[in-house]
Amino acid sequence: MSALQTMTEDLALQMLAQNGVAVIWRLNLAAAEAHRTGHPQSAAALIDLADAAEDAWLRAQGERRLS
């Protein structure tokens, strides 16, 4: 795993802890706005962050079911 992936996952976990699962939707909305206003690299970074948050949330849901 690259340093950028690790940093993205860490930030996603912090955002989930502070803002709950709704942060995934907000990140996707922000990515759409960034893309629409001509900032494709920012949009891609926000999508990566949203994906990392969603993956972490889904892993947590799976762990709860197994407990």
Segments the model singles out, each with a brief description of its role:
Residues 1-33, 56-61, 65:
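N-terminal acidic leader/helix
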